Amino acid sequence: MITDPIADCLTRIRNGYLSNILIIEIPYSKIKKNIIKILYNQGFISSYKIEKINNYKLLIKVALKYNKYTGTSVIKCIKRISKPSLRKYCNYTNIPRVLNGLGIAIISTSKGLMTDKIARKKKIGGEIICYIY
């Protein structure tokens, strides 16, 4: 049994790009789908697809993105911030900038998951899920 499914999702992505794997599979949940959707919209992954296995189990297939000239991953670091044992919250004035704006922070707010830039613009704080750069 997995105690932290978000950390499992981020670890699968990290292991995938460290091993230069093109497509990884992640068990489906709504919050994982929203994290993957944000990564896709920000250009960190090439594509994702939700597939049904055996008519009851859902998987998210994620195609990782690599630099076409150097072959290195677009994602340099993916780091879980708020953990089940230690939650990290911030209001909109204290939302951290990741690498001076080059990376993103995914924040869970009352309006759903969003990036740090959108949360600052909407003046909403929340729980810092992870940093990606």
Swiss-Prot record:
One GO cellular component assignment for this chain's record is: ribosome
Q: Do the record's keywords include Ribosomal protein? A: yes
Assigned keywords, A-Z:
Ribonucleoprotein, Ribosomal protein, RNA-binding, rRNA-binding
Instruction: State the PROSITE patterns in the record.
Output: RIBOSOMAL_S8
Disulfide bond positions: none
In Gene Ontology terms, what is a biological process of this protein?
translation
Q: What does this protein do?
A: One of the primary rRNA binding proteins, it binds directly to 16S rRNA central domain where it helps coordinate assembly of the platform of the 30S subunit.
Indicate the family of this protein: Belongs to the universal ribosomal protein uS8 family.
Describe, as the record does, how this protein assembles with itself and its partners: Part of the 30S ribosomal subunit. Contacts proteins S5 and S12.
Record-given protein name: Small ribosomal subunit protein uS8
Which species is listed as the source?
A: Karelsulcia muelleri (strain GWSS) (Sulcia muelleri)
State which gene encodes it.
Answer: rpsH
